[in-house]
């Protein structure tokens, strides 16, 4: 196979990996945790993965502590947890 063909194959495999959704067996366990605003009093929009609805939802994050199932963007939540 030529080097151009190898580069094309590598590019297609990389694109497939990026676009393939996370399967439930590959999903991090913290994606099962409930939304946790934490003890602080900030009012930040954040997102968490809801395993019952199998989607990412908005919630108000206080700005500290909480748990790892807290994302700044819905895209980050989907990329990490959504199947």
Swiss-Prot record:
Coiled coil: none annotated. This is Kunitz-type serine protease inhibitor homolog mulgin-1. Gene3D superfamilies: Pancreatic trypsin inhibitor Kunitz domain (4.10.410.10). It comes from Pseudechis australis. Residues 1-24 form the signal peptide. Belongs to the venom Kunitz-type family. It comes from the Eukaryota. GO terms for cellular component: extracellular space. The lineage of its organism: Eukaryota, Metazoa, Chordata, Craniata, Vertebrata. Disulfide bonds join 31-81, 40-64, 56-77. Keywords: Disulfide bond, Secreted, Signal, Toxin. Serine protease inhibitor homolog that only shows inhibitory activity against MMP2. Pfam families: Kunitz_BPTI. Residues 31-81 form the BPTI/Kunitz inhibitor domain. Negative results: does not show inhibition against serine proteases, and voltage-gated potassium channels (Kv). It is found in: Secreted. Expressed by the venom gland.
């Amino acid at each position: 196979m030529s080097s151009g063909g190898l580069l094309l194959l590598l590019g297609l495999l990389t694109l497939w990996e990026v676009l393939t959704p996370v399967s439930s067996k590959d999903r991090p366990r913290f994606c099962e945790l409930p939304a946790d605003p934490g003890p602080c009093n900030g009012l930040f929009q954040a997102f968490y993965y809801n395993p019952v609805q199998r989607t990412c939802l908005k919630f108000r994050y206080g700005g500290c502590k909480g748990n790892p199932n807290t994302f700044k963007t819905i895209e980050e939540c989907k990329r990490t947890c959504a199947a």
